[in-house]
Amino acid sequence: MIGKFQVYNVVASASICIALGMDSNLIFKSLGYLKPARGRMEVLSETKNKALVIIDYAHTPAALTSALKSIQEIIGRERIITLFGCGGDRDKNKRKIMGEIANEYSDIVIVTDDNPRNEAPSNIRSEILSGCPTATEIPNRDKAIKYAVSKLQKNDLLLIAGKGHETFQAVGIETLP
């Protein structure tokens, strides 16, 4: 599991179990079987060249900062590639800030669509890009992910942020695969 928050959660859970009188040896043996919640700093795959692909729900400035700081702590990673977008009909003030955060903690930033809902996707991306003007803009999320994966080199790390394990896009009143 990746991230300090995961450690904090495990320590808190183990402490509660011990306080309830559970066998501490059994608790510590079971730690090796823990898995993160789907879509929360979830390692999707490791490529042949040892690049990692991680997905996370990070859709707020604080969550994106936390995810990227956690990723920076992974030893032996060359570059961090971050792919994300911001949802439509939501807090517009966070878009530029999230672009700035991605720009600060990433070597490559790719901005794409993420549930534009009833807003013009190009406007959402434009607001994000105002915080990371050197980012690559690829509206279609599938194409953006394929592009990001094609950029992976040995020991790189790709963070696909914002949607966690969701496999749909909310566009207007439709939910598309």
Positions of predicted regions on the chain:
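C-terminal accessory "lid"/substrate-recognition subdomains
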Residues: 5-6, 35
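ATP-dependent carboxylate-amine ligase
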Residues: 12-177
